């Protein structure tokens, strides 16, 4: 927790890292959930996007020591881990090389969480499940992109995405950390297929808004409420025009 950090680190703006696949990589686009998060924590935390389109958890393991080296200079406040959409690609279909068996997926997530915790024991880690799949939307997207060469059989199904989502939630319970079941949450809304998914997999602005709300909710339920975090430097209203240095003495000197 921030209150447990040494005084020197308290004065540094903490980091929130978004780690995941293309759904994270695209999160800083207009209307993206990462951009919304950065706006919410403006002047209070740095929101960093570490999203890698097409990646599964197996490939993500190779990035851990580069993205989360031991002995980080800046404190990690929180890390979201948002994988599974590619792991759940069906074996023997067009996205076969991205497929990771669900048992391995769960263990890979465990390794990611353990490494992040080793880097920063007080960090808030939140697992996010893969989103639901609109199979008709995926097929329509493939036809519009590849024409007659488009896949005839689905490369992802909503049923399989649900299998991976449940393992993600189960692991979070085992580790005693937070999770966000986006797969279930989105399907609570009638017409979710077109409302939340742009191509049957990736998120519309409305879909991004769901993720943003859920992440901010979980952060606030834990200990990372933006409303309760101080600005990194004084608000302009606290600065005396005749003696500006006074406002900076406690935080900056």
What name fits each language-model region?
Residues 49:
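Conserved SAM-binding loop
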Residues 13-29, 53-56, 86-88:
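Catalytic nucleophile-elbow at a beta strand-turn-alpha helix junction centered on a G-D-S/GDSL motif
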Residues 2, 6-11, 32-46, 59-253:
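Alpha-helical cap/lid subdomain in secreted, periplasmic
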């Amino acid at each position: 927790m921030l209150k447990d950090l040494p005084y020197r680190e308290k004065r540094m703006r903490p980091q929130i890292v978004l780690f995941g696949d293309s759904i994270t990589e695209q999160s800083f686009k207009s209307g993206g959930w990462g951009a919304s998060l950065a706006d919410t924590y403006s002047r209070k935390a740095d929101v960093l996007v570490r999203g890698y389109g097409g990646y599964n958890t197996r490939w993500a393991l190779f990035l851990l020591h580069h993205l989360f080296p031991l002995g980080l200079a800046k404190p990690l406040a929180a890390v979201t881990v948002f994988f599974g959409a590619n792991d759940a690609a069906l074996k023997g279909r067009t996205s076969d090389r991205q497929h990771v068996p669900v048992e391995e997926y769960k263990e890979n997530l465990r390794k990611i969480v353990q490494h992040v915790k080793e880097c920063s024991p007080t960090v808030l880690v939140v697992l996010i499940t893969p989103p639901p799949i609109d199979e008709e939307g995926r097929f329509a997207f493939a036809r519009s992109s590849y024409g007659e060469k488009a896949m005839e059989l689905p490369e992802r199904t909503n049923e399989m995405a649900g299998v991976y989502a449940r393992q993600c939630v189960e692991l979070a319970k085992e580790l005693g950390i937070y999770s966000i079941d986006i797969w279930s949450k989105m399907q609570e809304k009638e017409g979710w297929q077109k409302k939340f998914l742009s191509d049957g997999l990736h998120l519309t602005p409305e879909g991004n808004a769901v993720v943003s709300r859920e992440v901010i909710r979980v952060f606030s339920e834990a200990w990372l409420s933006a409303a309760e975090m101080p600005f990194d430097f004084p608000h302009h209203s606290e600065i005396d025009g005749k003696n500006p240095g006074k406002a900076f003495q406690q935080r900056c000197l």
